[in-house]
UniProtKB/Swiss-Prot annotation:
The keyword Nucleotidyltransferase applies. One of its GO terms (biological process) is DNA-templated transcription. Its EC number is 2.7.7.6. A non-essential component of RNA polymerase (RNAP). This is DNA-directed RNA polymerase subunit epsilon. GO terms for cellular component: DNA-directed RNA polymerase complex. Keywords: DNA-directed RNA polymerase, Nucleotidyltransferase, Transcription, Transferase. The lineage of its organism: Bacteria, Bacillati, Bacillota, Bacilli, Bacillales. Belongs to the RNA polymerase subunit epsilon family. InterPro entries: RpoY (IPR009907). RNAP is composed of a core of 2 alpha, a beta and a beta' subunit. The core is associated with a delta subunit, and at least one of epsilon or omega. When a sigma factor is associated with the core the holoenzyme is formed, which can initiate transcription. Pfam families: RpoY.
């Protein structure tokens, strides 16, 4: 399944909406997403599963690139 992860680049600062970034990752579950990203030291705000029409919509975005992290 593909997940969209909303995150801040640093853990040390208070989250600011304007600095929120996103990435797409393939994983089995939200827990699996967190496990795969744990070494990146980012502040994960929200993990959203993507499927069906929502996934098709996101795939139209030119910035849509799925991270494939093996762990």
């Amino acid at each position: 399944m593909i997940f969209k992860v909303f995150y801040q680049e640093t853990i040390d600062e208070v989250p600011v909406r304007e600095k929120t970034k996103t990435l797409y990752i393939e994983a089995e579950s939200e827990r699996d997403v967190r496990r795969k990203l744990q070494d990146r030291h980012i502040n994960i705000e929200y993990i959203q599963p993507l499927e069906g029409a929502h996934l098709a919509y996101e795939q139209q975005n030119p910035d849509f690139h799925v991270l494939e992290i093996e762990q």
